[in-house]
Amino acid sequence: MKYFVLLHKITTKMLRFISFGSGSSGNCYYLYTEEEGLIIDIGVGIRTLKKQFRDYGLSLSSVHYVLITHDHADHIKSVGSISHECQLPVYATPNVHDGIDRNYCITRKLSPSMKRFLEPGKAVQLGAFNITPFSVPHDATENVGYQIKAEGVTFCIITDAGSITDEMRSYISEADYLVIEANHDVEMLRQGPYPQHLKERIESHTGHLCNRDCAVAIAENM
């Protein structure tokens, strides 16, 4: 099931965000300043990503960092390929890196020399970006969202999420810009063609966020 990226705002004068893919076919996002940028998840093909950069008049040489939220294939398919070709460090928690190593769907294994490790709740400074990963419930090896501060604003991204925790609410409330999952209408899901076990997975607290819960999280915390 495809989810939709909900944008509170899209750009500022100095900080810009582009969604290159959102859904089960591949997820990839780009956040950048005038000097440098970072990619969040690389679940699209590398040729597709290169074309999208060209279409926006951008160059992959402006990318300095890669952040990964979790180890499902639609978020990591090309992480090893892009890291190798562009010599990009890949930042993720140790558990997510372990999951990437075990995932047979990625097009190229990630080089150990390109791995960088993050800890949920602990901020790191990467160039212009102050980045704090935080835990998000989802049925991956581990899953995080990111609070990213740059150019005087606070950006928050939550991709796959089964439910909203108090910690997530705190990060949402601090955000000037929010990207968050809105995956499905509950009744449409229940009456739809998916097998029962998949419906139950999607609706579970480690599955995917329904449209109503997404709307409530925004209304109550922003």
Model-derived segments and spans:
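Structured catalytic core of nucleotide-sugar glycosyltransferases
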Residues: 18-29, 69-79, 83, 131-133
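Active-site metal-binding motif and surrounding structural segment of the metallo-beta-lactamase
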Residues: 47-92
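Active-site glycine- and acidic-residue-rich loops that bind
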Residues: 158-169
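Cap/insert and terminal regions of metallo-dependent hydrolase folds
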Residues: 167-222
